[in-house]
């Protein structure tokens, strides 16, 4: 399985609110790319059909997500810091290493359930250190380039 390189992209644009007024907003998206340049190009490509008028990519930063658990019914993204617990064979002491995971869910309880389901079969013990809702609006995974109608989907 290929390792994903996730980049958090901030996009600033004018959005029409529910009451009909326009307001400048900055939204956060996650993009799978090989470099900062590719991440910027990908977010421009993904956002162009959805934004009328001008928009600006104001920031691109690398995000160190090791796992992603997708729930098609979820409309929010949660970031979990999970501590993987291993035993040091020499000293016999417990060793904890942090891993950042992104979970799609409809609410906090579902995020915990989705994380637990995703971690089933994990060889080492683990515990949730933190779990919080993110401001990520959407995730754009790897795009299949061999089809003209290829769609970006979150990596599974």
Protein language model annotation of sequence segments:
Residues 1-7, 22, 45, 49-85, ...:
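Intrinsic disorder/low-complexity detector
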Residues 1-41, 84:
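The feature marks the first
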Residues 15-32, 49-52, 92-101, 121-128:
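A cross-kingdom feature marking solvent-exposed beta-strand/loop segments within repeated
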Residues 12-16, 26, 40, 44, ...:
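Residue-level signal for functionally critical sites in structured catalytic/ligand-binding pockets
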Residues 57-123:
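Short, solvent-exposed interaction modules
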Residues 35-51, 107-122:
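A short, charged, amphipathic alpha-helix used as a generic interaction element across diverse proteins
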Residues 16-18, 36-38, 67, 87-89, ...:
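Generic "edge-of-domain/loop-turn" microfeature
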